[in-house]
């Protein structure tokens, strides 16, 4: 298996990264945002929200609340409230109606307001920023598809586009499809077919996120932290773990899908990928399936995506706990 990620490491695991996060918070989105906020070598340029785990109203409110609790002076921009061509599909069976079921420690009424300009804000910020930008998406790809369709030149200043989604095998919302891709398959297909992203596009699929499991030992380590936000992390991950056990029967830990996407952006050497051709099925039986040419058998279709398949799990959690220590200084 070829590691195609180290070439983006720029010589140091602590090289500064400029990132924009497009998200649909969501329990694991909250942890992903926390990781980015606590990493000393990361500048969050902006946060945009999209339909997904719940409605846009709640994903936006949740993002605002997290940024406030983390003392982050980062603007939140509301994006697409529905898919490009279909009715919305929400993950309320996992995240509850408000996206953060069972969580009581986030502000009910965030002080800042979001602006309804996600696509334009992404374009102007990324295009005008004096350094290359890493774009990370942890929800359905509706905002990203609209960005690429409306402002195709934006890819000139995108160093990497990393999205959590897809699978080379089974799904988690249907037998065939992973939720983020299923929630807007047309958007995902448009993104994957964007030629100007070839070489920059990274998919973080279920294959690898189901290897990075947050278990009782990690939760116990989080309990030992004295800062207030650690209590929020413990609460939300405990609820998330219980839900996964009830819905999927997974008892040895909960996959932190979206955290993996942010961690790939910030610590590239922890991950191993394979370049392959990937597209999205729009057929009714396999709707939302990411069709992956793992063994390069379809020679007429050149590789367009770096698909992340392996992680250094022990080093991941060691890094994660070390970064969360910085919560005391936010």
Curated annotation (Swiss-Prot):
CDD domains named in the record: nuc_hydro_IU_UC_XIUA
Highest taxon listed in the record's lineage: Eukaryota
Signal peptide: none
GO biological process: nicotinate nucleotide salvage; purine nucleoside catabolic process; pyrimidine nucleoside catabolic process; pyrimidine-containing compound salvage
Pfam hit, one: IU_nuc_hydro
Positions of the catalytic residues: 257
GO molecular function: nicotinamide riboside hydrolase activity; nicotinic acid riboside hydrolase activity; purine nucleosidase activity; uridine nucleosidase activity
SUPFAM superfamilies named among the record's database cross-references: Nucleoside hydrolase
Assigned keywords, A-Z: Glycosidase, Hydrolase
UniProt GO cellular component terms: cytosol; nucleus
Gene3D superfamilies reported for this sequence: Ribonucleoside hydrolase-like (3.90.245.10)
Family membership: Belongs to the IUNH family.
Protein name in the entry: Uncharacterized protein C17G8.02
């Amino acid at each position: 298996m070829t590691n195609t990620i180290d070439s983006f490491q720029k010589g140091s695991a602590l090289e500064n990264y400029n990132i924009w996060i497009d998200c649909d918070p969501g329990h694991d989105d909250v942890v992903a945002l926390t990781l980015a906020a606590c990493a000393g070598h990361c500048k969050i340029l902006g946060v945009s929200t999209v339909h997904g785990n719940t409605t846009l109203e709640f994903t936006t409110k949740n993002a605002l609340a997290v940024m406030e609790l983390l003392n982050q002076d980062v603007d939140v921009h509301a994006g697409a409230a529905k898919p490009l061509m279909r009715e919305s599909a929400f993950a309320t069976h996992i995240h509850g109606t408000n996206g953060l079921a069972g969580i009581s420690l986030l502000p009910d009424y965030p002080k800042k307001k979001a602006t309804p300009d996600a696509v334009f804000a992404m374009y102007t910020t990324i295009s005008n920023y004096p350094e290359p930008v890493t774009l990370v998406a942890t929800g359905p790809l509706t905002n990203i598809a609209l960005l690429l369709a409306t402002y195709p030149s934006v890819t000139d200043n995108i160093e990497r586009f990393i999205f959590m989604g897809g699978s080379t095998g089974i799904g988690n919302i249907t037998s065939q499809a992973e939720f983020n891709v299923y929630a807007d398959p047309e958007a995902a297909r448009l993104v994957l077919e964007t030629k100007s992203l070839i070489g920059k596009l990274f998919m973080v699929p279920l294959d690898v996120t189901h290897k990075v499991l947050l278990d009782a030992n990690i939760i116990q380590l989080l309990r030992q932290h004295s800062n207030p936000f650690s209590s929020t992390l413990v609460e939300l991950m405990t609820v998330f773990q219980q839900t996964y056990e009830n819905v999927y029967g997974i008892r040895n830990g909960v996959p932190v899908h979206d955290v993996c996407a942010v961690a790939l952006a910030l610590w590239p050497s922890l991950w191993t990928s394979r370049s392959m051709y990937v597209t999205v099925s729009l057929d009714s039986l396999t709707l939302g399936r990411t069709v992956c040419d793992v063994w390069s058998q379809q020679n007429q279709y050149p590789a367009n995506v770096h698909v992340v398949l392996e992680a250094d799990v022990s080093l991941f959690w060691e890094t994660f706990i070390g970064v969360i220590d910085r919560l005391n200084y936010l």
